[in-house]
């Protein structure tokens, strides 16, 4: 499948992981659309094309809003990549590609560092896989973005 632009969507505390993924993809020259607001995420589904890829992150995989987004994305014929902690979650039914984290949370630790770290580990593995798929392109843009932000250091 030829990738157009990845869209990144999440609910709750998962902003950290998607911001990390947006940063990593941009470093390799992949333009990313990242809408932190749920209404913007909903509206963005109306402009999806079949070659677009949407990354949805939900620890439980059962958040109503992320399920609605994934269902809308699939109805547009786009690919849904889901990152969740539960193989049997409702989100899996709306996923074309499933990436699982391995972490535990309890009611007192919602959004705990352990779950975010597990998520970032999966995101880093995804990033490395994408970068290795086209190393010349990735290396070029990693260097180009490094040169661009180098001027911001004293």
Please describe what each predicted stretch is:
Residues 2-121, 125-133:
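Glycine-rich phosphate-binding loops that contact phosphosugars or nucleotide phosphates
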Residues 136-154:
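A short, charged, Gly/Pro-tolerant segment at domain boundaries
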């Amino acid at each position: 499948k030829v990738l157009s632009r990845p869209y990144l969507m999440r609910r709750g505390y998962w902003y950290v992981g998607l911001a990390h993924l947006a940063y990593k993809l941009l470093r390799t020259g992949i333009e990313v659309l990242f809408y932190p607001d749920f209404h913007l995420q909903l509206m963005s589904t109306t402009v999806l094309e079949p070659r677009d890829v949407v990354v949805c992150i939900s620890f439980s995989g059962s958040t109503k809003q992320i399920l609605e987004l994934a269902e809308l994305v699939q109805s547009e014929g786009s690919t849904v990549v889901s990152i969740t902690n539960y193989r049997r979650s409702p989100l899996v039914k709306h996923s074309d590609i499933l990436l699982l984290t391995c972490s535990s949370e309890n009611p007192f630790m919602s959004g705990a560092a352990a779950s975010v770290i597990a998520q970032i580990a999966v995101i880093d593995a995804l990033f490395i896989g994408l970068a290795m798929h086209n190393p010349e392109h990735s290396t070029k843009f990693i260097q180009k973005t490094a040169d661009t932000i180098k001027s911001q250091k004293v």
